[in-house]
Amino acid sequence: MVSTPEIKNQLARPDALGRFGKFGGKYVPETLMPALGELETAYQKYRDDASYQTELQNLLRDYVGRPSPLYFAERLTEYYARPDGTGAQIYLKREDLNHTGAHKINNALAQVLLAKRIGKQRVIAETGAGQHGVATATVCARFGLDCVIYMGIHDMERQALNVFRMKLMGAEVRPVEAGTGTLKDATSEAIRDWVTNVETTHYILGSVAGPHPYPMIVRDFHAIIGKETRVQCQEKWGGLPDILLACVGGGSNAIGLFHEFIDEPSIRLIGVEAAGEGVDTDKHAATLTLGRVGVLHGAMSYLLQDEDGQVIEAHSISAGLDYPGVGPEHSYLKDIRRAEYYSVTDKQALDGFQQLSRLEGIIPALETSHAIAYLETLCPQLNGSPRIVINCSGRGDKDVQTVAKVLNY
């Protein structure tokens, strides 16, 4: 664990250059620099603007349904209890209950309000699991903006429900066949579109990745998750959680939960990546576990690379974790040892998916299922009765067909 001054300093990051330590930055074509500058200026102007905040807070309450509940998972807690009844007390931060079924709406809504204020009529986004695409299509429908979503062809097949939802709300979904037809390729295509149409188009990047100011903006718009959690913990037991647990692909749901508590060194921050078919194979997405530092999609971070420094393809049963990079702030938190990152396999995630469904009647997204599955490793290591808050980042409706196919239901 790092010293308190180092942790305190973290809250001021990124620095003026958009860096978290050596990570982050702006590695983009010159044509995008004015747009990134415009976005940062607009964000700095409006984040403290009373009319912007009033509109955002009203919509988060009345349209999204915030605050999302902090739910005590009684039967999951009992499952991991010791014979004497002690053990971890497990709570779920229910982002799955938000409008559209995941945390992604927090960022999409706040960004579309920025896009309106800077005069952009066309919005583009990338999506993997489809939840960010659905959230973006949703807010564009709400505000009458043109919407184009880039999605890998492979992800469109395994997330067909979300493709239909996006189209139903008026979005154009453009299939991306390049590479493996997954999230990395969709992001690359979205950036190409933005370079071409930068004057008229706002790019709602869906995770805490990409060039500055996106990792900062997306984090800040998701920080409401942790802020609500702090208040709810105080209401429920008059204190703080002991452990925060979340899945990590790009890392937006995790940083949304973690950020409020980074300067609380007694709280463990644990991110869970996708080990796919195993970290000893070439089919995984365990970027923080096995990656090396490089540049992808405009930012320096840990990446999955080959010996020549070429980005290699990631694999996960979960479309939202199937990404060979990670947000730069997570790379920084790993390096200063403020957060811990582990990985679980597709098989373990499927077990977590079924476990939460059967014990709590809550069907989690396959992304969330990775965090649920890590309890199997974590709980036996713990002493006493620590309180664990898991970010239930999304619901599993979108994954039911995939899981049914794999498990032969």
Curated annotation (Swiss-Prot):
The Swiss-Prot or TrEMBL record lists the needed cofactor(s) as: pyridoxal 5'-phosphate
N6-(pyridoxal phosphate)lysine is found on 104
Top-rank EC class of the record's enzyme: lyase
Q: Which SUPFAM superfamilies match?
A: Tryptophan synthase beta subunit-like PLP-dependent enzymes
GO CC annotations, alphabetized: cytoplasm
Pfam families noted in UniProt? PALP
Similarity comment text for this entry:
Belongs to the TrpB family.
This chain belongs to which protein, by name?
Tryptophan synthase beta chain 1
